[in-house]
Amino acid sequence: MNIQALINDKVSQALEAAGAPAGSPAAVRQSAKPQFGDYQANGIMGVAKRLGTNPREFAQKVLDVLNLDGIASKVEIAGPGFLNIFLDETFLAQQADAALADSRLGVSAAEAQTIVADYSAPNVAKEMHVGHLRSTIIGDAVVRTLEFLGHKVIRANHIGDWGTQFGMLIANLERIQAETGEVSMELSDLEQFYRESKKLYDEDEEFAVKARGYVVKLQGGDAYCAEMWKKLVDVTMVQNQRNYDRLNVSLTRDDVMGESMYNHMLSNIVSDLQTQGLAKESDGAQVVFLDEYKNKDGDPMGVIVQKRDGGFLYTTTDIACAKYRFEELGADRVLYFIDSRQHQHLMQAWTIVRKAGYVPESVSLEHHAFGMMLGKDGKPFKTRAGGTVRLADLLDEAEVRATQLIESKNPELAEDEKKTIANTVAMAAVKYADLSKHRTTDYVFDWENMLAFEGNTAPYMQYAYTRVASIFAKAGISMDSLEGEIKITEEKEKALIAKLLQFEEAVQSVAREGQPHIMCSYLFELAGQFSSFYEACPILVAEDETVKQSRLKLAALTAKTIKQGLSLLGIETLERM
């Protein structure tokens, strides 16, 4: 149950009954401090101002018709017109019992939509680097959350598998085969292979001519070029899948929807834009002029959809892509997890898409932009030599550091268990350090912070789960064999339950806003509430069996909520660390 939404509806009804215009926002939020109740309605002052009435007097009118029977024990008018809402203890206990009995922990299923999520999108013939990390893990966390709510999610890994660079790659592949009769296509060699191809293209005119010829042949469907191109794609995706599997990211080869997939649509789209009068010839190119964007002279900005040589641009592909996702995939929402520097490019493509009628306004096109990963010097994260950090190297280092950490904390563990724990902690640390930051901000990558057992980190959250689970292991009790009802006898129990019952609010916020840090913050606060409860309320040595069973139920619901929340982030838990 989403208690915030329930109370918001009740306050909205009361607002209208008290004379507010229909649809006036109740603006119910979680209270910042316990003395202000569990929830606070903040919308009354704004409505009173529009009505020209005293906010506190209007708040009293709302309170007179507000029906929170069985939900709130007390509602107070505070300040200039806030409503502080204190939840009823019986209501809280009943909802906690219901959540524990439910495999979904009380989270209601949403009205199912078809949602396309575009994320990760590495380039072919190049290794994944740290710049791909944010799109990959943020997108995957949101996808997992949407699926948990019951949506049909189509993962779209929009890989860079097309373009003029493939001419030089195929030409170099042919050169190596002619010289050696064999070519190793291990991806560790492919990064070097790409650099070598580029050098030849830049410095050897004969090679460059051949490469440009292969571009034309590949675009024309030449069988040999297509075979070489497919080999490059296959080799790249095998290596990428290793990274996905290590990171516990749910993408597979079946989710690849590369740029090449839309090639057959591009010429028809340009023709249609011309027919609609949207695309016009300008200096030999086909250009769409957008009044919504101005150039430096204040004139409508021109967006090229076809170059004078007949070639198409990324914008053309993105127009086709959005059209395909609506017409062929039936998308209700399309989420693009692409870095913030691409924002104007996407907005221009979507403006054209809307003007052309390819995607109706009822379908939501959303750019979930993200900031950069920075080094401690505040500059983009690089190797010591100033080069790009390979993602695989970053994950290797995380495992080495986590192994040292586990060795220092628990040296008596068996080697195989040590390795399992270290690998799980390593991947969790890399992911959580990113996911716990607001998506749109840059963040500093810091090994010491991300592997710390204090603060809002993966090791802390994994240990929080292990600590709760150990209560049951110590007592030899199963979380699923508890009896009796939850009873609130202490203030710390009530505070823990109130936080536990905010789980659905966190889940729905992540799904709506594409912001996984909301879940991280929620889980961190929950772990803190459990610590306070654990210190104040004895569990296994409680004064009687009824209280013991009730507190064990709260511990079980805490463990299950942390485990489920971390799972939605793509992070695994451990029974012991």
Curated annotation (Swiss-Prot):
Gene Ontology MF: a single term: arginine-tRNA ligase activity
InterPro entries (alphabetical): aa-tRNA-synth_I_CS (IPR001412), Arg-tRNA-ligase (IPR001278), Arg-tRNA-synth_N (IPR005148), Arg-tRNA-synth_N_sf (IPR036695), ArgRS_core (IPR035684), DALR_anticod-bd (IPR008909), Rossmann-like_a/b/a_fold (IPR014729), tRNAsynth_Ia_anticodon-bd (IPR009080)
Cellular compartments per GO CC: cytoplasm
Reaction equations catalysed: tRNA(Arg) + L-arginine + ATP = L-arginyl-tRNA(Arg) + AMP + diphosphate
Record family assignment: Belongs to the class-I aminoacyl-tRNA synthetase family.
NCBIfam families the UniProt entry points to: argS
Protein name: Arginine--tRNA ligase
Lineage, broadest ranks: Bacteria, Pseudomonadati, Pseudomonadota, Gammaproteobacteria, Vibrionales
